Amino acid sequence: MPRPTSTLPKAQHCRAQASDSFQKRFFRFEFVYPKAENIVYKKTPVLTDNVMHYCPGCSHGVVHKIIAEVIEEMGIQDKTIGVSPVGCSVLAYNYLDIDWAEAAHGRAPAVATGISRVHPDRYVFTYQGDGDLASIGCGEIMHACNRGENIVVIFINNAIYGMTGGQMAPTTLLGQVTATTPYGRDAKLNGFPMKLTELLAQLDGTCYVTRQSVHTPANVRKAKAAIRKAFENTRKDKGTSFVEIVSTCNSGWKVTPVEANKWMVDSLVCST
């Protein structure tokens, strides 16, 4: 069979062959396009890109993340106002891209009450530690819950004053060693641990009271569901929702993050 001839001039035909050969050698992947991304996780835009100041192993970062995810999923970023008082979370406004108000030590429920009453269409929540809420702020939280203010209270309980050096808090366990109880908490000297969640659950103004933790992926999901339910209660104007998160403080407890998680499960979770 005769070989097909090219219609190109000889010199032009040689250049075309050379060009084809060059492309085959050096551009063999030219028409291979990447597959579409299969995104399995994406940081919520409600969280800023600021580096958190919390200690490695601290529970605050995880709780910030699930709060931010709930706010995004509910589509309420521009309607949410957080209130943060004195404590490790005093800089929370650097990490969640929502409106924030700062409150004096323990006074976040009072500030949240004022904001909620002036802006009843907003989702108002406080973010407080046990040294803040259960001690100097005990009166504010008791009366806000008793009135049934339409707010969410997120209570981070690590049974110690974390920011100020690891002193005894109202929720410190009996026998627990702190900077101010070097031989362990003694009921005769220091009283018993304050079980604030159980106290608030008995008030008529609270519509939802729960205790959660974030020490395992399963518990993180449960805590997130609890926080979402609390915000949904605000949407329905049901009253005060109180979510306690039993947390770690490895720097205050003077242990490693791994040891802190184990101690929390063995001692704090089981005793609360």
Predicted features by range, described:
Residues 5-6:
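Conserved core architecture of multi-subunit DNA-directed RNA polymerases
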Residues 9, 14, 20-162, 225-229:
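Thiamine diphosphate
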Residues 14, 18-40, 44, 49, ...:
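Flexible, low-complexity linker and terminal segments
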Residues 55-56, 99-100, 128-130, 185, ...:
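A generic structural signal for short
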Residues 135-152, 156, 160-272:
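Glycine-rich ThDP/TPP pyrophosphate-binding loop and its adjacent helix/strand module
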